[in-house]
Every structure is written in structure tokens, then in C-alpha cells.
């Protein structure tokens, strides 16, 4: 009986948050590393289905870095990176498109359908909602077919949300001539969140959030203002690999998104715990 009462208490706690976020858009960036963890992925997709069921409007944007690298290796193509961006020649682009649009995007959609949700894969093979152009590297390096998103077809995405369906979008864009480009998944998610006027953008990571001590998960900072985050970077508290994540969060806030979250996607039901509980499980960055 005590366990049943505890479950009821949890539902009551969630009720206030459900009312608050009902009808609001949350963009969820799903990274390549989590796509390899089948158990974690299953719980994350169940979380997304729950969010849609109780009236939120989740949108999933995904990459697939590890799977792409493995597929390129099988094809005899050596992966090359310049400042974190994958150099994408014509042969590499074929592999990227096959993995993102032909495999992962379809698989994620089918998994959500099997779990009882309604999802639609929006890729260049079906309906491409990300328009863009070739990314010009500021250092002058030619990254090949690497692009940046300049326009999002929000009408298509919102029409799905209004009919209780979840859009699942790979990090690929096309230009006005139909040329395909590989896009960084973080920046693709940011563009989608900005275009939709999302209330939240959630980066699913392999760390539990911003920590005062990078080696100690117990030092997680539950909430930060944009100003506090900039100060922690200046003070050296936020450093190394966490800096680009936090800078991406700050850029997203600057584009009008209300809140950005960094959470550990490997934690069971981390999405629900972050959004529907008072304390959350990651770091929330806000203006």
C-alpha cells in the first residue's frame, strides 16, 4: 500500500508540471552515443511518448556520429574531423545519408510506434523540413558537404503536433537546388527549437549536467542563469568538453528559447524526471 501511495504522490507532483507545459513544444536532441545503448534508448522514447500523451509537443532531432563512423570504416572510408566537424566528401555523404535517413531515422520512428506512440520520420527521403546551405568554415578549411540550417518548415512539424504525432528529424538539410548536407545535430536542434518557439530544448548527454567538479557527479548545479553560466566559464569552473555544450545552450537562449536542459540520457526516465519533478536530475539554464 505504501508503494501505491508513493506512486500516487508522484503523479500529483507531476500534475502541476503537466498543466504548466501542456501545449508547449520541447525539442529533444538525441545524440549518437545514446543510440547505441538500447535500454537507455527504449526508456527515452517511452518518455517522449508519455510527454505527447499528456499534452506536451515533443520534437526529436537526432544525430548518429558513432554509427556513421562505424559505417564509414566498413566502407573503407577514414573519418576526418576539423574542430569537431566531420569532413564530408561525396562518398562520406552517401554513408551519412544512409545511416541517418535510411536507418536510424526509420528505426527510431518504428520503435516509437511499437511502444504505442505515433511518430513520423521527416528526412530528405520523406519530407525534408530542414533547408540550409554549405557551411563556410571561418578558418578557411573546406569541410565538404557540411551545411548549416537556414530555414525550418515549421508548418509541417506543427501540423504533426496538432494531430498528436511526434516529428523525428535527422541532422540533414538540403539547399534550394536539392543538394544534401550533413549538419551538426546540436545546431540542427537549436535551429528547430528557435523556429518553433520552443519552451525547452533538452540536450541528452552522457553526463548528468554542469558540475562544479567535473569528476564528481554530486556537484551538479541544478539551475543556472545565462549570466551565471558565463561567469562559471570565465572562472574556469566550466571547462573542456562542457564549454561547447554550455555555449550552445547560451546561444539557444539568445534565439528566444525559454530554457535549455543538459541531462544524462542514460539515466532511466531522465526526461520525465527532469521535466515533471521539482528538483529535476540535470542542469537547467535560463535567461
Swiss-Prot record:
It is found in: Cytoplasm. InterPro entries: AceGlu_kinase-like_sf, AcgluKinase_fam, ArgB, Asp/Glu/Uridylate_kinase, Glu/AcGlu_kinase, NAGK-C. The keyword Amino-acid biosynthesis applies. It catalyses: N-acetyl-L-glutamate + ATP = N-acetyl-L-glutamyl 5-phosphate + ADP. SUPFAM superfamilies: Carbamate kinase-like. Its EC number is 2.7.2.8. GO terms for cellular component: cytoplasm. It is an enzyme of class 2 (transferase). CDD domains: AAK_NAGK-C. It comes from the Bacteria. The keyword Nucleotide-binding applies. GO terms for biological process: arginine biosynthetic process via ornithine; L-arginine biosynthetic process. Keywords: Amino-acid biosynthesis, Arginine biosynthesis, ATP-binding, Cytoplasm, Kinase, Nucleotide-binding, Transferase. Coiled coil: none annotated. The record marks 29, 245 as: Transition state stabilizer. Catalyzes the ATP-dependent phosphorylation of N-acetyl-L-glutamate. This is Acetylglutamate kinase. It comes from Rhodopirellula baltica (strain DSM 10527 / NCIMB 13988 / SH1). The gene is argB.
Amino acid at each position: 500500500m505504501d508503494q501505491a501511495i508513493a506512486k500516487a504522490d508522484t503523479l500529483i507532483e507531476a500534475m502541476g508540471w503537466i498543466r504548466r507545459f501542456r501545449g508547449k513544444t520541447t525539442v529533444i536532441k538525441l545524440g549518437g552515443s545514446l543510440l547505441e545503448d538500447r535500454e537507455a534508448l527504449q526508456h527515452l522514447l517511452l518518455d517522449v511518448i508519455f510527454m505527447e500523451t499528456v499534452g506536451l509537443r515533443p520534437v526529436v532531432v537526432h544525430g548518429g556520429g558513432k554509427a556513421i563512423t562505424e559505417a564509414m570504416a566498413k566502407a573503407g572510408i577514414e573519418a576526418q574531423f576539423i574542430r569537431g566537424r566531420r569532413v564530408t566528401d561525396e562518398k562520406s555523404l552517401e554513408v551519412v545519408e544512409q545511416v541517418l535517413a535510411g536507418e536510424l531515422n526509420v528505426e527510431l520512428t518504428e520503435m516509437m510506434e511499437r511502444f504505442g506512440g505515433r511518430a513520423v520520420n521527416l528526412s530528405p527521403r520523406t519530407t525534408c523540413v530542414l533547408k540550409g546551405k554549405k557551411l563556410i568554415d571561418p578558418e578557411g578549411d573546406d569541410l565538404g558537404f557540411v551545411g548549416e540550417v537556414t530555414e525550418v518548415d515549421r508548418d509541417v512539424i506543427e501540423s504533426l503536433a496538432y494531430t498528436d504525432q511526434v516529428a523525428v528529424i535527422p541532422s540533414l538539410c538540403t539547399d534550394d537546388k536539392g543538394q544534401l548536407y550533413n549538419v551538426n545535430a546540436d545546431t540542427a536542434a537549436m535551429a528547430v527549437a528557435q523556429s518553433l518557439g520552443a519552451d525547452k530544448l533538452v540536450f541528452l548527454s552522457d553526463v548528468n549536467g554542469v558540475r562544479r567538479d567535473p569528476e564528481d557527479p554530486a556537484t551538479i548545479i541544478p539551475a543556472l542563469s545565462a549570466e551565471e553560466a558565463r561567469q562559471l566559464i570565465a572562472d574556469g569552473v566550466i571547462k573542456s568538453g562542457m564549454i561547447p555544450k554550455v555555449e550552445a545552450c547560451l546561444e539557444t537562449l539568445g534565439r528566444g528559447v525559454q530554457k535549455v536542459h543538459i541531462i544524462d540520457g542514460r539515466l532511466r526516465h531522465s526526461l520525465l524526471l527532469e521535466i515533471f519533478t521539482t528538483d529535476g536530475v540535470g542542469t537547467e539554464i535560463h535567461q
